[in-house]
């Protein structure tokens, strides 16, 4: 195979393969004026903060995939998903670099729901949504999504 950027070409048969980004979605979940954040249980970023979410499966919309991931990781269903931001990300998994396009939504969870960390989430933590240190997030894209969340909350009068 001969590589030309993100395109692989076979000089023998002419087959062409394009390496595209993977889609991922994450949610900033607000519950009773607190932000629910996950602690990553696996690499990349093990032990760092993250939002519930993950890769979108074939034939899923961003919203469907995100709702599935939240259920898998925290065992809860959430309210309406409101778009916040998107950002490119570099995701190094098992030594293989993946380029992803990460989209972030804002949503709510009932204060009565029981959060159960599962899948690749080792724990969850509750934060004042305006007082999270962005450097504690595992990924730069999540930091960018968080800053957009803070801007939207301040615009709404949160202090």
Where is each model-derived feature located?
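A short coil-to-beta-strand element that immediately follows conserved catalytic motifs
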Residues: 1, 77-86
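A generic structural micro-feature
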Residues: 19-21, 48, 95-101, 116-121
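Conserved hydrophobic "DFG−1" position in protein kinase catalytic cores
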Residues: 29-30, 37, 107, 126
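Conserved Nudix-box catalytic region and its N-terminal flanking loop in Nudix hydrolases
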Residues: 30-72
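A short Gly-Trp-Pro
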Residues: 31, 52-58, 104-106, 143-144, ...
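Nudix hydrolase/Nudix homology domain
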Residues: 114-159
């Amino acid at each position: 195979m001969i590589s030309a950027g993100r395109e692989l070409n076979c000089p023998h048969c002419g087959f062409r393969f394009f390496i595209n980004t993977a889609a991922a979605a994450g949610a900033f979940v607000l519950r009773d004026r607190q932000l629910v954040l996950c602690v990553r249980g696996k690499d990349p970023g093990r032990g760092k903060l993250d939002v519930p979410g993950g890769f979108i499966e074939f034939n899923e919309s961003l919203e469907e995939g995100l709702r599935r991931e939240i259920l898998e990781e925290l065992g809860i269903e959430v309210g309406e998903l409101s778009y916040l931001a998107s950002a490119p990300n570099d995701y190094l998994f098992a030594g293989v670099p993946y380029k992803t396009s990460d989209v972030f939504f804002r949503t709510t969870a009932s204060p009565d729901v029981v959060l159960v960390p599962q899948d690749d989430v080792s724990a969850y933590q509750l934060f004042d949504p305006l007082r999270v240190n962005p450097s504690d997030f595992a990924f730069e894209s999540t930091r960018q999504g968080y800053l957009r969340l803070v801007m939207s909350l301040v615009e709404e009068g949160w202090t």
